[in-house]
């Protein structure tokens, strides 16, 4: 059983067929089994919907369908961004003034630490700077 965190990069590449990473991400998706578990956050899903909001009706519809599906999928843990989690992310954001981490990245990193996750479906090298293993280098 794999335990994976899923970043905005992955969801967008999965949906957007013109994304240069689409083929690799789609192929990886085929390897996810019923025993695997994945985590993402409300903040990540907000980024996905925001990024695809002006990409046309079809893609917007697919993005909403993806989010709706993730929210009910028993393999997927969509972590709610509570005030406490927001403040944890903000604390990391504040502690790394020399980095270019987004607040969403900081929230994701805090969730990964809390859940003991080490692998993330992203190409964002910021995660390697915090000791995580990105699966799309």
Language-model features: where?
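Acidic, PIN/NYN-like endoribonuclease modules and their adjacent C-terminal/linker elements
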Residues: 1, 109-137
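Amphipathic alpha-helical segments within well-ordered protein domains
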Residues: 9, 49-50, 90
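Structured helix-beta-strand junction loops
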Residues: 34-35, 73-74, 130
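Short glycine/serine- and small hydrophobic-enriched flexible loop segments
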Residues: 50-54, 113
């Amino acid at each position: 059983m794999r335990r994976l965190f899923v970043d905005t990069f992955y969801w967008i590449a999965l949906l957007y067929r013109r994304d240069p990473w689409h083929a690799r991400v789609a192929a990886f998706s085929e390897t996810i089994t019923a025993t695997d578990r994945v985590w993402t956050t409300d903040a990540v899903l907000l980024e996905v919907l925001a990024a695809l909001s002006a990409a046309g009706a079809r893609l917007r519809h697919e993005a909403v369908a993806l989010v709706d599906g993730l929210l009910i999928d028993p393999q997927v843990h969509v972590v709610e961004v509570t005030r406490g989690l927001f403040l944890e992310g903000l604390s990391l954001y504040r502690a790394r003034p020399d980095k270019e981490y987004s607040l969403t990245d900081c929230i994701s990193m805090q969730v990964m630490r809390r859940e003991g996750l080490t692998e993330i479906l992203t190409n964002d090298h910021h995660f390697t700077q915090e000791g995580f293993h990105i699966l799309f280098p």
